[in-house]
Every structure is written in C-alpha cells, then in structure tokens.
Regions:
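A beta-strand edge to alpha-helix "cap/lid" segment located at domain peripheries
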Residues: 1-25, 33-122
Length: 122
C-alpha cells in the first residue's frame, strides 16, 4: 500500500463536495481520460465540464475495499466508490466499482485515467 497515492483520493473527493473545481483540475493529469458507468469517454476538459455543469452535485464521496498497486511512477487504485449526491434536487446514494490510474509527475500523484462500473450490492 502506498500512502502517497491513497492520500491523493481524499482531496479530490472533498473538492467535489465543495465544488472546488480548481482543486479537482489541479489533480488531473494533462492527458486525463475517464469512462463513466454508461461507457461514455470524457477527456480532461469534458470531464471538468461535466463536473461543473452536469446534473450531479456531490455531498460526499468515499471509497471502500481500496487496493493500491504501485509500479514505479504509476499506481492503480481499485475499490468501491460511494457517492452521496443530489441529482435534479433529489438526494441519492450511488456506488460503483472503480479503477483509478495515477502517474507521479514531478513528485506529485496526478489522476491519469479512471473508469466506473455499476454494481449491485444486494
């Protein structure tokens, strides 16, 4: 387990809840790409546009069953993300399997790629 890359998750999650888009943007790698649970691929600017202007507003985000695998300046986090959000005025709790890839750039972990998949928790 790598405390450095694990610690990179929390500030982004907190920034989502605070709608602090500058913090989110600063954590994204310049070549960031994200595939959502609907299979839609968003590059860095499209992802930021979705966060700023999309229908979701985060109240809180957490991750459970986190596993971190590091290889040099690359690290992969897998786990289950729990999103407490507001969608069109309605409070919702969503959960997804997630894979997040980070690259260490000048000593700082940057979020390079992510994918979420819908899952049934029973």
């Amino acid at each position: 387990m790598t405390a450095g890359v694990e610690a990179a998750f929390r500030p982004r999650a907190d920034a989502l809840a605070a709608q602090d888009w500058a913090v989110v943007e600063a954590q994204l790698h310049e070549h960031f790409v994200y595939t959502n649970s609907h299979g839609e691929r968003l590059m860095r600017e499209g992802y930021l546009d979705f966060l700023r202007d999309g229908p979701l507003r985060w109240r809180h985000q957490s991750i459970e069953d986190m596993l971190v695998v590091e290889a040099g300046d690359t690290a992969v986090i897998t786990g289950i993300v729990f999103d407490h959000v507001v969608i069109d005025g309605e409070e919702r709790e969503l959960h997804f399997a997630t894979t997040q890839t980070y690259a260490r750039v000048d000593g700082t972990w940057r979020y390079l790629a992510g994918q979420t998949s819908a899952m049934d928790l029973g």
